[in-house]
């Protein structure tokens, strides 16, 4: 179960397809405490899932989001998730397995995908799907096989958008007493003399696009900091290591 909780972030990041939708209107201005057990940076699927799991396991948690609203790119997601061997597939008599999805990912990804990450995404997709339902996410039961999928294994939220995941997750965090603080741009991971991360320095009241905005504040983390932010697609060097076709000429 511990491995499942750690790896759930990767599954939530990898499970959705993107479409252009307006950003979800979740703005929170709760007062920060000087210290938490866990600090989560980023309020998309991965960050909110991590925050829920940590809070359910007894941690005092805060989620920091640099934008004025929560949700990140997940708010623009199509709310779709590939789930091999799901309970919905079994009910409809569709044979599928994590191994089949892994083979599809390796084939479409030209063998460039990290084997361990593929293993996490494929083997934990079904339990993660069941976990989202416990958090209040409602999924349609009509299955589809998008793109390179060799089986009908993709499910979409009842709303047909990523908000079908974000809204229940935000409600759950409210129930758990976890603040999601917007307008907080993390600019540094703070470390002790041994190099252990013990907190963050962030710009409070940061306004996206106005780099001179915000006041630096330090927030301590007793147990750790979870990095659940995106944006790697803007890093040409990193993305070309993942796929040589994604050069700086790609617009």
Role assignments for model-derived ranges:
Residues 54:
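Aromatic pocket-lining residues of Rossmann-like dinucleotide-binding sites
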Residues 191-218:
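Conserved beta-strand-loop-beta-strand element in the redox core of flavoprotein oxidoreductases
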Residues 60, 66-179, 183-188, 195-196, ...:
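Conserved N-terminal/central alpha/beta ligand/cofactor-binding core
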Residues 32-44:
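Beta1/beta-strand and adjacent pyrophosphate-binding region of the FAD-binding site
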Residues 47:
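N-terminal Rossmann-fold NAD(P) dinucleotide-binding loop
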Residues 25-27:
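Boundary at the C-terminal end of the N-terminal hydrophobic targeting segment
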Residues 1-15:
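N-terminal secretory signal peptides and thylakoid transit peptides that target proteins
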Residues 207-214, 220-251:
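Glycine-rich loop(s) and the adjacent beta-strand/alpha-helix scaffold that form part
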């Amino acid at each position: 179960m511990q491995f499942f909780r750690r790896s759930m972030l990767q599954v939530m990041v990898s499970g959705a397809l993107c479409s252009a939708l307006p950003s979800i209107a979740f703005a929170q201005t709760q007062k920060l405490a000087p210290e938490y057990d866990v600090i989560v940076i980023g309020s998309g699927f991965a960050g909110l899932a991590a925050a829920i799991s940590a809070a359910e396991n007894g941690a005092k948690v805060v989620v920091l989001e640099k934008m004025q609203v929560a949700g990140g790119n997940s708010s623009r997601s199509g709310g779709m998730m590939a789930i091999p061997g799901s309970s919905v597939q079994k009910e409809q008599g569709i044979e599928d397995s994590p191994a089949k999805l892994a083979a599809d990912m390796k084939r479409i990804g030209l063998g460039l995908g990290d084997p361990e990450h593929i293993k996490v995404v494929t083997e934990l997709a079904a339990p993660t799907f069941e976990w989202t339902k416990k958090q209040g996410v409602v999924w349609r039961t009509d299955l589809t096989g998008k793109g390179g999928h060799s089986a009908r294994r993709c499910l979409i939220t009842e709303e047909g958008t990523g908000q079908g995941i974000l809204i229940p997750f935000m409600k759950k965090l409210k129930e758990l007493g976890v603040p999601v603080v917007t307008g907080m741009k993390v600019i540094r991971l703070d470390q002790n003399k041994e190099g252990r991360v013990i907190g963050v320095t962030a710009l409070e009241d940061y306004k996206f696009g106005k780099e001179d905005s915000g006041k630096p504040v330090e927030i301590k983390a007793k147990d750790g900091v979870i990095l659940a932010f995106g944006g790697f697609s803007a890093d040409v060097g990193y993305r070309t290591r993942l796929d040589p076709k994604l050069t700086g000429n790609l617009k």
